[in-house]
A protein has these predicted regions:
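Hydrophobic core of transmembrane alpha-helices in multi-pass small-molecule transporters
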Residues: 22, 102-121, 313-326
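Primarily marks hydrophobic transmembrane alpha-helices of the MFS/SLC 12-helix fold
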Residues: 77-80, 84, 107, 291
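Symmetry-related core transmembrane helices of the 12-TM Major Facilitator Superfamily/SLC fold
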Residues: 170-189, 376-395
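C-terminal transmembrane helical hairpin of 12-TM major facilitator-type secondary transporters
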Residues: 285-332
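Short amphipathic helix-loop junctions that connect adjacent transmembrane helices
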Residues: 33-47, 243-259
């Protein structure tokens, strides 16, 4: 049986992965845009919010760490269905726990399910997206991440509207959870099986043990860690914005209720625009040059967000922040996938490093902010994005002689 997709199958596969990226962004913005409401409903301080985020972050890291084994055993298709349903249930529990039960434990359980599901999904959908990019032969991974950002833009907009209309978090989150579950089921039937999409022909298929060996081997390669530094700084900046930009706007600067969701939306718009149109720029100027320019933009934007004396300047800072943090993660994933023979293993390893920062960083910021203030804490992000820019040379494309040689078939 040939492992070749028809044009129609490929288009449906690509559309399904676009939709999955969008749903992931939508789910994160649903939580992030309602953090002030959840905090008020449960009467939490920043450290307690940070503790809830820590529960989500730990669960996410567990999900990320186990996802390569799941992909090796069952393929991404089934794994993505299960994990999307998990975080759909999780985001619904967060809403119910915040306003219906007024229970921190229920919210924490919801965030753990949400974190585990989203963490696992992030690795799987990026493995699928890099496989699509390899088949297309051009830089398209930023466009997939643009759909994630588009999901956060729309999610933040819905969150701002819900906050303005004083819609309870329970109603808002339940509707979003149901929508995500529908997307998961529809996409399951559009994503091809592992054998059709990603595996070699039956005679060349690897055992599960061989797949795990290749996956673990990526962790012994220095380039994986250098790419990880690039991704870590930008992922920390993106995750910090998703979870703290709303509170930084409303409580750090003291602006009106609802302006936090607006700042998150502005950040997400900046990120989305660059991800949509950034691919051709990368193909023309190269990954390294683009990453260095964006690191300067991110550092400048975060500084302006922290120091801006009025709302318009703070929003300009949020936009620059989003623009600068836009391509660090997807270009890191593309760099990890330069060698098709080891793409899945290296993408999984790089994604793990990036998502540890993306999901584990915000709780750390929360705890630190209790001692030095939220806006002062964001200076940490400036240092991290500068480090990301300095290490961006690791993302240069591999030469042909640096790639794994294709196996020769015996006659």
């Amino acid at each position: 049986m040939e492992s070749v997709l028809t044009r129609s199958q490929f288009v449906r596969w690509r559309a399904a992965i676009f939709a999955i990226f969008f749903a992931s962004g939508l789910s994160i913005a649903t939580w992030a845009s309602r953090v002030p409401s959840i905090k008020a409903d449960l009467d939490l301080d920043n450290a307690q919010v940070g503790l809830i985020l820590l529960g989500m972050g730990v669960a996410s890291i567990v999900g990320i760490s186990t996802s390569p084994a799941v992909v090796a055993r069952t393929g991404a298709r089934r794994g993505m269905l299960v994990t999307m349903l998990l975080f759909a249930v999780g985001i619904t529990l967060v809403g119910l726990g915040a306003t219906l039960f007024a229970s921190v434990p229920v919210v924490l359980i919801g965030m753990v399910l949400f974190g585990f599901g989203n963490g696992s999904l992030d690795v799987m959908m990026n493995v699928e997206a890099t496989a699509i990019e390899q088949q297309m032969g051009k830089t398209v991974l930023p466009v997939f991440h643009a759909f994630f950002s588009l999901g956060t833009v729309i999610g933040a907009g819905i969150g701002a509207l819900a906050a303005h209309l004083t819609t309870t978090v329970a109603v808002h989150a339940s509707i979003m959870g149901a929508l995500i579950a529908v997307v998961a089921i529809v996409c399951f039937f559009q994503v091809p099986s592992r054998e059709a999409a990603l595996d070699p022909t039956p005679g060349e298929q690897q055992s599960w043990g061989d797949r795990m060996h290749v996956a673990l081997e990526a962790w012994r390669e220095p380039r994986t860690y250098l790419i990880g530094v690039v991704m870590l700084g930008m992922a920390f900046a993106e995750g910090g914005a998703n979870d703290w930009i709303a509170l930084g706007t409303e409580q750090g600067h003291g602006f009106a209720s609802g302006t936090g969701a607006v700042a998150l939306a502005v950040f997400s718009v900046g990120m989305t625009v660059v991800r949509i149109f950034g691919g051709p720029l990368v193909d023309r100027f190269g990954r390294v040059a683009v990453l260095r320019i964006l690191a300067v933009a991110a550092a400048s934007g975060i500084l302006l967000f922290i120091l801006g004396p009025n709302l318009p300047l703070v929003l300009v800072g949020a936009a620059l922040w989003g623009i600068g943090a836009s391509l660090g993660f997807p270009l890191g994933m593309s760099a990890a996938a330069d060698d098709p023979a080891k793409a899945a293993a290296r993408v999984s390893a790089a994604a793990t490093i990036g998502y540890v920062a993306f999901l584990g960083g915000p709780p750390v910021l929360g705890f630190i902010s209790e001692h030095i203030g939220l806006l002062n804490t964001l200076f940490i992000l400036v240092a991290l994005v500068v480090a990301s820019g300095l290490f961006s040379g690791a993302a240069r494309p591999l030469r042909e002689d640096e790639k794994t040689a294709a196996p020769t078939k015996s006659a």
